[in-house]
Amino acid sequence: MNSQQIYETSHMISNENLDVRTITMGISLLDCIDSDSTVACQKIYDKITTKAKNLVKVGQQIEAEYGIPIANKRVTVTPISLIAAASQDHDYVKYAKTLDKAAKTLGIDFIGGYSALVQKGYQTGDRTLIASLPEALAETDFVCASVNVGSTRSGINMDAVAQMGEVVVAGSKLDMMTNAKLVIFCNAVEDNPFMAGGFHGVGEPDVVINVGVSGPGVIKTALEKVKGESMDVVAETIKKTAFKVTRMGQLVGTVGAERLGVQFGIVDLSLAPTAAAGDSVAEVLEEIGVAQVGTHGTTAALAMLNDAVKKGGIMACSHVGGLSGAFIPVSEDAGMIKAVNAGTLNISKLEAMTAVCSVGLDMIAIPGDTPKETISAMIADEAAIGMINNKTTAVRVIPAPGKKVGDTVEFGGLLGYAPVMAVNKVASTAMINRGGLIPAPIHSFKN
């Protein structure tokens, strides 16, 4: 970077909501496995609080020294279904409470990895963990969970899809916010620094630092300078801006990893919005020329945005990964909320948009009386998009008890608020009740 680019980056931070959304430490818990769950939980607590003891302090030091805001300090761990399977416990909530205790000790924002990978079937412990999700998430403050129900190589586990519909409904009855901390994936990635879907994959190093950047406001401001120019110019502008944003993320990641004495992993190139004014992916799409997000042309604009961000970011950092795309959560994006309230954006259009970006139907409030089979069918549709297109897709929907279409649900903090959106009233009950496995697509057979 030359001095002019450094000045521009500084201006982005001070005036355009640019920040590092998260610095996330991934920690393997494979060496914490024990047939005695009490011993295992103690090992888990000790390892997390030892390895990540300086994470918050180092993050704050980097903020102070470089003037770069770091919104969140987080930890991800090995999927707990793999760790807890060695025990004979019939309930894994104690593992979730151990993670929560560690998060509180460290002072971090979230801890992810109360997870199960069931894309091709259940292993010992998977059903137990999934059944415990409503209670585990309701009784903890900082724990995030995810379940991978499908992949391009394996197909879609429809038994798990059906079970997750039940879990989402059960969670909403205990505490609506449980579902804000639960993501159901197809093609989940092992190095995701973002929540609620982050976990530490078994192929990852023992301890690693991954970084997630932000930057919708920066992209929007850059595009305001090229009004009326061709799409070629728009794409080039996004690329150059994404380069600067990613450079900042790599700086934070490499410095943080060095000071913590661990390996640097990846920068996730995702554009992550917030509910704050000027920090919206929807507003970027509208700056490209879409009259309001959700109308015709939205999917094309989003596809170009997503691709240009990746092209610019990958030139700035030799190690990119995670989800790396444009997030389109409804509750966390002021422009999305406005479009839903105007009737321009609905769930069907959001589903189409997920085919060209990351990750999926995210932070969407739906009526509290939505049947579990309808939620399962939404999960199946998203998983199918991910499976066929060889990309990560996900569902994070929040049934709001007592709420109907048009009501507003407040989540608070970074999660913002959301209008309750309509779902199709005709349920695909017979399809969901079939269970079984949707086979992997023909183009997954590449060996």
From Swiss-Prot:
Membrane-crossing residue ranges in chain numbering: none
One of its Pfam families is: DUF711
InterPro entries per the UniProt record, alphabetical: UPF0210
Instruction: Spell out the family assignment given in the record's similarity comment.
Output: Belongs to the UPF0210 family.
- Quaternary structure and interacting proteins, as annotated: Homodimer.
PANTHER family to which the protein is assigned, alphabetical: UPF0210 PROTEIN MJ1665, UPF0210 PROTEIN SPR0218
> Under what name is this protein listed?
UPF0210 protein Lreu_0940
Q: What is the lineage of its organism?
A: Bacteria, Bacillati, Bacillota, Bacilli, Lactobacillales
